[in-house]
Every structure is written in structure tokens, then in C-alpha cells.
Amino acid sequence: MTKPTQVLVRSVSILFFITLLHLVVALNDVAGPAETAPVSLLPREAPWYDKIWEVKDWLLQRATDGNWGKSITWGSFVASDAGVVIFGINVCKNCVGERKDDISTDCGKQTLALLVSIFVAVTSGHHLIWGGNRPVSQSDPNGATVARRDISTVADGDIPLDFSALNDILNEHGISILPANASQYVKRSDTAEHTTSFVVTNNYTSLHTDLIHHGNGTYTTFTTPHIPAVAKRYVYPMCEHGIKASYCMALNDAMVSANGNLYGLAEKLFSEDEGQWETNYYKLYWSTGQWIMSMKFIEESIDNANNDFEGCDTGH
């Protein structure tokens, strides 16, 4: 490994670990008991992904395929103060407390609204401008009219992500970061059959978050507060189920508005096309009417985490 590559690996590894630490802090702030809550390992900065944005160009100039940076950004999407984990936990508590068992209630709508907003602002605004796209289908006669991101690995080359030293520090504060098995911090095959995942756990409360990304541009995050007494907990988004996002976009659009108001774009998107849970694409257009991208969200159980979407609604 050359010296510049070693420097890049160290730098990006630090950023990746910082993102994980921030996720841990967010979980502790929400769930930890006041008298035993682990100390904050990092200062709170909201939103955390702004820091990733500041170093994006530097990473792009030095990364071979950008997978390190994409993993960092995805981690910050989940960990940010405005992110899915904290909101999902609160929604779960409210839904369980009110015994709501219909995904069409405010519980489901609130979670979906947040997912749309944050996903547009972070994933679309950050991931989709990193590198080239590929066609949705090789059988597409045009070959490059729309594209779907292929982000299927958590590390470049054969560089392992070793969490042992980090865990030595975190364990002193009641925190664990564990892989699903011993090999899952190493780059996997670039196919949808292989996934990479890690689990962040608050040892005081047993609250943990599973962060998984699959091949073919799909991701899943699970927040799983343990509420065994509630029989219908599986109907609450982000409680014991996960949310998967699939998306495609116009080949040459970077999905960043002139004034950077991605949240405004997301809010407009959600208010104008409420769609149907699990079925409809959410479509985004420029003010000229030109299609930018389409997104699709689906709730899924942990036991059914490998399904994927076929094709793409191009908005026309």
C-alpha cells in the first residue's frame, strides 16, 4: 500500500469511526437512564452530515471508488440529530403507548415524512453526486437515460474495518459496536446476495440499531427497542421493522438546488404527492418540469431483508 493510500485510509477510517461514535451518542441521549447514562464522547453537532459535506471534495480527489465516503455519509444520515434513529424511537414509543395498529395512522405518516425529507437532503444531495451512474437495466435500449446507484461495499479493496481498539474504549462507557459475524467488516462480493452490517448497542438499555446496506443501491436501517409486552409492535415503522429505500435519477442531474435548499425540495415533494405506503414512487422535478429522480420506500421485516425493486419510474 502506497503512503498516500495509507494516509487516505487512516483519514477516512477516523471519519467513519467518528460517525459511529456520533450515532452512539445520539442513542445514549435518547435512551440512557439519567443516573447511569454513558458520558458523551463527542460534542453535539447538528446536523453532523454538514461536516461530511465540507470534506467531500477532498475525499473525491483521493478515493478510488468513493465507497468509504458513501458509508460515512450513510452513517451520518442515521446518526444526525435530525436523523431517523431518534425520531423513529420516539414514534415507536408514541405508537406503542397509544396502541395504534394501523400503518395509515399518524405514526406511519410521521415516520415516512421524516424519511422522505432526510433521505432527499442527505442521500440524494450527497451520495448521488459522487461519481458516475450506471443504467437501471442492461437491456435498456438507451443505456444511460436513468441510473441507479450501485453502493454495495463498506470498504475499498480488501481493507478491513477493525473495531477492536475502538470497542476497548467504548466498553468503558457501556457501549458496544459489533458485527453480525467476524467477516462483515471486510469488503464483500458486489452482489445483492451479500450485505454489510454493524450493530450499535447501548448496554444499559439494550437499545440497539442495525445498519445494513445491500447491493443494487438499497439500504435498510432497523431501530429495535425491546418492548416484548406489546403484541402488535411489528406494525410500527422503525420499531421492529426496517425501512428500505430504492431510487434512481436522471444521469446528469446532481440533485442539488442553486441555494442548497434540499429540505424545501423534500417538503414540496412530500406535500404534493403523498402516495401510498410501500407502493408509489415519490418523484422530484425541477421548476421547469424536468424530472430529477424517483424514490421508493418499503417497510420490511428483518427476516425479509433481501428483496429488491425492479426498474424505475422515470416520472413521465
Swiss-Prot record:
Highest taxon of the lineage: Viruses
Region forming the signal peptide: 1-26
Cysteines engaged in disulfide bonds, as pairs: C92-C248, C95-C312, C107-C239
GO cellular component: extracellular region; host cell membrane; membrane
GO molecular function, one term: carbohydrate binding
Additional note from the record: The killer phenotype requires the presence of two different dsRNA viruses: an L-A helper virus and the toxin-coding (M) killer virus. Killer strains of S.cerevisiae producing the toxin K1 kill sensitive cells but are resistant to their own toxin. The gamma and delta chains may play a role, on there own or as part of the protoxin, in the self-protection of the virus-infected killer yeast (toxin immunity).
Protein's recorded name: M1-1 protoxin
